[in-house]
Design a protein with these regions (language model features):
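A periodicity- and composition-biased signal for non-globular, repetitive helical segments
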Residues: 9, 15, 32, 43-45
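A short, exposed loop/beta-hairpin motif centered on an aromatic-Gly-Thr core
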Residues: 17-32
Length: 88
C-alpha cells in the first residue's frame, strides 16, 4: 500500500514563525491535492494548529524519505502543504 509523507507549515498563534510538521498516510488509492488538504485540516483541528501560507498544496514527487524531506525544504515560501510518495 503506498505511503505518503505529508508536510505542512503551521503556527500555533499569531506572530509565530511558521514551522514544518509532517505525518505519513497510507492509502490504497492515489491521493490528490484535495484529499491531502482534507487530512491536514482534520489533523490541525484536533491539534489546535493554524495553517500558514496561501493554502497551496504541492506534489514533490516520490523517493526515499530523506529525498522527499529535502524537496520539502525547496518549496516556495508561500507554499502551505507539500506531499510525496515514500519508497519503501
Amino acid at each position: 500500500m503506498p505511503k505518503y509523507l505529508i508536510s505542512y507549515r503551521k503556527t500555533e498563534g499569531g506572530g509565530q514563525k511558521p514551522e514544518w510538521t509532517s505525518f505519513t498516510a497510507q492509502s490504497e488509492t492515489s491521493l490528490e491535492a484535495h484529499a491531502i488538504r482534507e487530512r491536514v485540516d482534520r489533523r490541525m483541528s484536533v491539534l489546535g494548529e493554524q495553517l500558514w501560507g496561501t493554502g497551496e498544496v504541492v506534489w514533490v514527487g516520490n523517493g526515499r524519505l530523506d529525498d522527499v524531506l529535502y524537496r520539502r525544504e525547496e518549496a516556495a515560501p508561500e507554499t502551505s502543504i507539500v506531499y510525496g510518495l515514500v519508497e519503501e
